[in-house]
Design a protein with these regions (language model features):
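A short alpha-helical cap/connector motif
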Residues: 1-108
Length: 110
């Protein structure tokens, strides 16, 4: 069991929506970014649990960004996690993100 799957399994905080078989794939591709200044963007954040999972997994140097259409999600911001409200189908909105996020190393569309 890798650290992502362990976090998911032991999580008692915010709800995380992920397919369990994704964790091995995520870990294989993302582990090299741990403890770096990685910029992660996740589109579709639901309850915000996966943003917290990414923050813990990548470490304190990481900057985690969430994108969701639901204005409620803005309330899920915390230190190290910034949330933008908008529609991923809106090209103008997506273009504006490139002005607000200095770089994107990992983009997760959930």
């Amino acid at each position: 069991m890798n650290d992502l799957e362990r976090y998911f399994t032991e999580n008692t905080g915010r709800l995380i929506h992920k397919w369990k078989h994704y964790f091995a794939i995520y870990d294989r591709h993302f582990s090299r970014f741990r403890d770096t200044d990685v910029h992660v963007v996740e589109i579709g954040i639901s309850q915000g649990g996966s943003l917290q999972m990414w923050k813990q997994y990548f470490g304190p140097k990481a900057k985690i960004f969430g994108v969701d259409i639901n204005p409620y999600c803005k309330k899920l911001e915390e230190e190290g996690i910034e949330i933008f409200i908008g529609d991923q189908e809106n090209r103008t909105f997506l273009k504006s993100l490139t002005q607000k996020i200095p770089k994107i190393d990992i983009l997760i569309d959930d």
